[in-house]
Amino acid sequence: MTRPSVKLLTTLLACLMEMLNFRVSSGKDPDLLSSSSSSMSPSDFLDKLMGRTSGYDARIRPNFKGPPVNVTCNIFINSFGSVTETTMDYRVNIFLRQKWNDPRLAYSEYPDSSLDLDPSMLDSIWKPDLFFANEKGANFHDVTTDNKLLRIFKDGTVLYSIRLTLILSCPMDLKNFPMDVQTCTMQLESFGYTMNDLIFEWLDKGPVQVADGLTLPQFLIRDEKDLGYCTKHYNTGKFTCIEVKFHLERQMGYYLIQMYIPSLLIVILSWVSFWINMDAAPARVALGITTVLTMTTQSSGSRASLPKVSYVKAIDIWMAVCLLFVFAALLEYAGVNFVSRQQKEFLRLKRRQRRTQKEEDLQDGRLHFSSYNTTTCVKDGAVVKNTQVNQIQQPSILKNTETNRKKFVDRAKRIDTISRAAFPLAFLIFNVFYWITYKIIRHESARKD
C-alpha cells in the first residue's frame, strides 16, 4: 500500500471517529443513548439536572427577562366541609395542581418520559408564589408523609400537586334564609410576581373536579361552576388572579322540622282558646300566655345560629307573623272578656242612676211609699194619699236586666265565632303569599343569578 493511500485511510478513520463522538455527545443516537443512560445513575442524573454542578438557580424564574411564565391550575375537591353563617366562611379539602414549563429542566440523557421526584426536591426548583386571596386559615397534610407530588417531563414541564385544607371567606346574603342560594368564591393569586413575570390560567379540560358522592349537610352543590379572572391592581403592580365560584343551594328540610312546623303548631294551638268557654278565664289566659312565651323562645332560637345582620330575613318575617297571630289570639280573649262584662257595668250604672235619683227626691222633699195598692206621698210636710206616681215594677227590671245581659253575651260569643274562621283564613292567606314570594319568585331569581 502506497503512502498516500495510508494517509487517506487514516484521515477517513479520524473523521468517522469524530462523527461518532459528536453523535454520542448530542444524544441523537438511540443505541448510544441507551448505553450512556445505563451507565449514569439516577442520583448522578439529578445532580446534573438540578444539582450544584448543573448551574440551575431556583431563585430565578424560567424565561428570566423574557415572556411571563404561564401556569395552568386545576383543583380536585376531596371534601366540602361546613358552611358557617355566623363567621361567613366555608371549609374545603382540595388537591391543588399547578403545571408550568421550565426549559432548564428539559432532559434527553434519561430514557423515562417523566420523573416522579421526592417532595424534598421541591426546594431545589423554582415554584410559582400562589396563594389564596380569600383564605382565612389553611394547613398542609403530612400523614404519613408530606402530601406533595413533583413530576418533571422531558420537555421541562413541571407538575406540582399538593393537598390542602382551607377555610375561605364567603360573604353571604341571608335575605332569603333559609331558602337562599349562596355563591362562595375561591381566588388563586400571585403574591410577588406581576403579570409581566407570571400568569395563572385554568386548565382547559377539567379545571375543577369534585369527588364522587360529595354531599353537604345543609347545601346542594350545583354542577355549574363559574370560572373567571380576578386580576388585582395594587400600588405595587398588576397581579394575576383566577377564581372559581361555587353555587350552594340550601336544603331547608332541617329548618322545616326545627322551626317552621313547631311555630305553625304553636299558632294553631293558640286558636284552641276560641272554642273554650269565655267564662273559663284561667284556662284561656294560661293558654294564651304559654303560646306567646313559647313563640318568643322559638323566635329567639331561630336567630341564635345566624349573624346579627341589619336586614330582615325570611325566617324573621315568619317568626314575627307567627308571634303576632299568637299575641292577637290572647288579645282576642281580652276583647271577649271586656264585651261580656259590659252587662255588669251597665247594671252598675243603672243602680248608680237610681241612687242618684233617690237622693235628688229626698233633697226636693218628695218621698214615695207604696203599700197595698195605696200610694202615699209626703210633700212639704203634708201627707197626700192616692197620688199617681210612676212606679218601677220589679218584673220589668228583671226582664230588662236579662235582655241586656243576653245581648252582651251574644256579642262576646259572636267575636269568638268570627275569630274561629278569621284567624285561620288570615294565616292561610299569609302562607300563600309567603311561600310564593320566597320559595318560588325570589328562589328562582337567586338560581338564575
UniProtKB/Swiss-Prot annotation:
Function: Subunit of heteromeric glycine-gated chloride channels. Plays a role in synaptic plasticity. Contributes to the generation of inhibitory postsynaptic currents, and is involved in the down-regulation of neuronal excitability.
Activity regulation description: Channel opening is triggered by extracellular glycine. Channel opening is also triggered by taurine and beta-alanine. Inhibited by strychnine.
Ranges of the Cytoplasmic topological domain: 277-282, 335-420
Pfam families: Neur_chan_LBD, Neur_chan_memb
Protein residues bound to glycine 1: 97, 161, 236
Protein residues bound to glycine 2: 97, 161
Reactions catalysed according to its record: chloride(in) = chloride(out)
SS bond list: 170-184, 230-241
Compartments (UniProt record): Postsynaptic cell membrane; Synapse; Cell membrane; Cell projection
Site residues (Important for obstruction of the ion pore in the closed conformation), renumbered to this chain: 293
Protein name (record): Glycine receptor subunit alpha-2
Signal peptide coordinates: 1-27
Residues reported in the UniProt entry to bind strychnine: 97
Miscellaneous field: The alpha subunit binds strychnine.
PROSITE patterns: NEUROTR_ION_CHANNEL
Membrane topology annotation: Multi-pass membrane protein
GO cellular component term, pick one: cell projection
Keyword Disulfide bond: yes
Disruption phenotype: GLRA2 morpholino knockdown leads to axon hyperbranching of spinal motor neurons at 24 hpf.
Glycosylation sites: 70
Binding site for Zn(2+): 224, 226, 247
Lineage: Eukaryota, Metazoa, Chordata, Craniata, Vertebrata
GO function terms (MF aspect): chloride channel activity; glycine binding; metal ion binding; transmembrane signaling receptor activity; transmitter-gated monoatomic ion channel activity
Organism of derivation: Danio rerio (Zebrafish)
Residues bound to glycine 3: 236
Residue ranges of the TM segments: 256-276, 283-302, 314-334, 421-441
Family named by the database record: Belongs to the ligand-gated ion channel (TC 1.A.9) family.
Extracellular-side positions: 28-255, 303-313, 442-449
